[in-house]
Amino acid sequence: EKVFNKVIAFSDAEINKFSTASLITRSTNDVQQIQMVTVMMLRMVLYAPILSIGGIVKVVGNGAGMGWVIFIGIAAVVILMGTLMVIAMPKFKVMQTLVDRVNLVSREILTGIPVIRAFGREEREEERFDEANKDLTKNTLFVNRVMTFAMPILMFIMYAISILIEWVAAHKIDAGVLQVGSMTAFITYTMLIIMSFLMLSMMSVMLPRASVAADRIQEIIDTDVTVQDAAGAKKLETPRGVVKYDNVAFAYPGADENVLENISFEAKPGQTTAIIGSTGCGKSTLVQLLPRFYDVTEGSITIDGQDIRDLTMESVRQNIGFVPQKGILFSGTIASNIRFGAPDASDEDVKLAAEIAQASDFIEEKEHGYDSAVAQGGGNVSGGQKQRLAIARAIARKPKILIFDDSFSALDFKTDVAVRKALGEHVNDSTVFIVAQRVSTILSADQILVLDEGTIVGKGTHKELMQTCEEYRQIAESQLSPSEIAASLGTDSERQV
């Protein structure tokens, strides 16, 4: 639970550092390794010392004078297990890394099956998985062979000690200084002692892998979360939703150059701020700074004049409705997905959110309507339907700030227009951000920011930018026909969102 809670608290920077596949392995397989060893320790660690101590007491009391034989046996067991641990420990470390690799490849293949099939790369991906699996199998077989080799040696030591005792005892019996009964008792007690050390040695076989797993888990626990509440952070109370970026710059952790530079603008309630630009110019990064998926490197972002770093993340995010580029759904029902950010939303609120997102038609066509099941990852709905449900989920929260991170890309033009029109009618007091690739999506925005290589090169309405910003004009002319451009310039004042 502690590991999972820490992972949930990670920002995107920490998640990218470990990778999703590695975090899954560490949160499941590594934890299971420690659980298994803990159970074994509870069973053996108490039982084995009792056997060994009891056996030693009896051997000393027996007076057979063969205690040195026992020490030879114990020394042999300790040397053997120490040698095996030295050989196996590095392989255990490699094994967990290879488990990460197999999980990563499996996850990539399973999520990318449509692309793999479309490009006819099934055979290559099978080879890639086979390669990762063979590496893991090879490493696992080596470790298992080493550990399998240990048991015959341990049994050999136990029987060799028994034979040695009988040989020494035979001479003592022949000399008349030892009774047969004492020899039998001594052998029994010696076997108890050796058996207890065998049990402990079996624990030592499991400890290396558990130790590696513990180190990997501890690495997660010891990792500092870069985005967290400051000491004395305040709650964002009854916000109006005025958002201001003041000379913001941002660089990804470990990067040499800023992704964003000198970003300054203000977004007000009831208005739509659109962001457009070429691929990779920092559009999504800009809006992801607002809910603090990352923290700014320089400058500040404020809501109603309060720096978001001085506010609790929970209170900031509770007032934001975020729709990512790729719609993400969870297993459950359509209603539970729409209520994801607003568990107390009424049935009417859920239906209204679906209507605004233009999702109500396909929902009501289903046999069970809003109670229809949603498969893991939304596998039983189309891309457009998934995106509309994601939009409905954000709207149902009734946030003061709405962020659409290229969320209309999966919608056809007609649905795009209908969604924006409904938003203008029902969500007219929120501060709206729209990241877009299509100029047609943002024609009616109150403010358009044009990004180029991480800086704002244009700011204004569509009509203003067509006159003042060369980059925006090139984008518009590449997407719209002359007649569409003329129509858009003539109707700039008729805004929907």
Regions found by a protein language model. Give the residues of each.
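Helix-loop-helix
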Residues: 54-79, 85-86, 142-216, 220-221
